């Protein structure tokens, strides 16, 4: 699913809610569900835009490193099989 809102927009929505706008009204006004709002609040609550961008960058880097680790572990297992198979 394609993201419709940027981190900057999401933080803006959260700030509107903090300023006193009812969640249902905020969701209706901007066209997203209250479930999305509460998910965003759990993830971005209290953050500034720069902090949200940093979080996103760290999540991307974490995913990349996990993939590299998994590939390295597979390579190690393959090498163990080759070494055990030699006379």
Swiss-Prot record:
GO terms for molecular function: DNA binding; transposase activity. It holds the Pfam family HTH_Tnp_1. One of its GO terms (biological process) is DNA transposition. Keywords: Transposable element. Belongs to the transposase 8 family. This is Insertion element IS407 uncharacterized 10.0 kDa protein. It comes from Burkholderia multivorans (strain ATCC 17616 / 249).
């Amino acid at each position: 699913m394609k993201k419709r809102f940027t981190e900057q927009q999401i933080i803006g929505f959260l700030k509107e809610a903090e300023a006193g706008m009812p969640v249902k009204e905020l969701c209706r006004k901007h066209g997203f569900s209250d479930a999305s709002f509460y998910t965003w609040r759990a993830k971005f609550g209290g953050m500034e835009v720069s902090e949200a961008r940093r979080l996103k960058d760290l999540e991307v880097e974490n995913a990349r490193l996990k993939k590299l680790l998994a590939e390295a572990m597979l390579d190690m297992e393959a090498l163990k099989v080759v070494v055990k198979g030699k006379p």
